[in-house]
């Protein structure tokens, strides 16, 4: 059996795409909201929203910069990346990101 790190998400962006430029290229960062609906024990309908941090580089970063705006519905495929960094106070912080490998632009806002 082959082991994989693959995720597919369909949702709406929560903010404008942020572009971070480097000497050898750029990355695009944006948050994506996905929602699930269920009925709780009291018979009430509940909506639960999860926020995901998307990161793309190369041609995908260019596409996101040009075509993705706040509220845009998109579908992405990618992999889950866990990383850590030290903040300004020297405290180790952990972050989970989705490294985008494919993107499909869906309906408008």
Predicted regions mapped to residue ranges:
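Single-stranded nucleic acid-binding surfaces, predominantly the OB-fold ssDNA-binding core
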Residues: 1-109
């Amino acid at each position: 059996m082959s082991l994989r790190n693959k995720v597919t998400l369909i949702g709406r962006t929560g903010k404008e795409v942020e572009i971070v430029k480097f000497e050898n290229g750029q990355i695009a960062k944006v948050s994506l909201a996905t929602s699930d609906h269920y009925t709780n024990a009291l018979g009430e309908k509940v909506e639960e929203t999860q926020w995901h941090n998307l990161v793309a580089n190369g041609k995908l970063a260019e596409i996101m910069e040009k075509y993705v705006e706040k509220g845009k519905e998109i579908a992405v495929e990618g992999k889950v990346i866990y990383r850590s960094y030290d903040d300004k106070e020297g405290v180790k912080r952990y972050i989970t990101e989705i490294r985008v490998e494919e993107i499909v632009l869906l309906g408008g806002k």
